[in-house]
C-alpha cells in the first residue's frame, strides 16, 4: 500500500513543482515581474561576461527535457524496480523539487534587484544539481534513464554553472568591486578561463559529456556578443579570444574523457572471468 501511494503522490509532487517553476518563469517574461524582464535586469548591470540574449534560448531546451523527466516519473514509479534504482530516483526527485523552489525564489529576488539574495539562491540551486549529478556517477543506467533522467539534468547543470558565474559577476558590479585593481577585460579573461577549467574538470569527473554543451554554448554567445557590431564590436579582443580558448579547453577535456573511458579501469579487468563472475546483462554507464 505504501509503495502504491508513493507511486501516485511522488510523481504528482514532482509535476507540481515543475509546473509552478514554468509558470513563474513565464510570468517573469509576460507580466513582467516588477516591470522588468529577466534580460532587462541583467542588462542593467553591464559587464563583459554576460552572454547575449539569444543564448538564453537554451532554457526552452532545458524545460522541454525536464518535461520529459516529469512525464517519465509517472511510469517509472508504477513499475517494480530494484531498491537501489528506486532510491536513486527518489533522491533525484526530492532534489528536483527543492531545486524548483530555489528556481522560483531566484526569479522573484532577481526581478526585485535583490542581487545578493539571488546569488545565494542560484548557488543553492547549483548545489542541488551537483548532488543530482553525483547520484548518477558510476551508476549503470538503462537507455531510458539516460534519456529521461540524466540528460535533462546534465543540460540543466551545465547552464546553471554558467548562470552562477554570471550572477556572481553581476553581484560584483552591484557592490562596485574594483577587481583587485585589475582592468575589467583582464578580470573577465580570468573568469572565463577558470570557468572553462571547472566545467572541464566537472565533465571528466562525472563522466558526463552532455554537461559541457550548454557551457560551450554560452562561451560561443560571449564570442558573438564581443565581435558583433551591436555588441562590443571587437573592443575587447582578449575576452573573446579567452572564450575561444575556453571552448578549446572543453573540447580537449571531452577528447580526454572519451579516451579515458575506453581504457581498462583495472588490470584485473583484463583477466579471464570465472564462470560465476560472468554477467552478460551488464550495461555500460
Task: Name the predicted role of every residue range.
Residues 2-14, 59, 213:
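N-terminal membrane topogenic signal
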Residues 6, 75-79, 136-140, 254-271:
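Membrane-interface capping segments at transmembrane-helix boundaries
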Residues 16-23, 91, 95-106, 122-134, ...:
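Alpha-helical transmembrane segments of multi-pass integral membrane proteins
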Residues 18-35:
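Alpha-helical transmembrane segments of multi-pass membrane proteins
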Residues 43-58, 147-154, 177-187:
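Short aromatic-rich membrane-water interface segments that cap or initiate transmembrane helices
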Residues 50-56, 180-197, 224-252:
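Membrane-interface transmembrane-helix boundary segments in multi-pass integral membrane proteins
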Residues 105-119, 175-182, 203-206, 229-234:
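Membrane-interface helix caps and helix-loop-helix hairpins in membrane proteins
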Residues 210-222:
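Central hydrophobic cores of alpha-helical transmembrane segments
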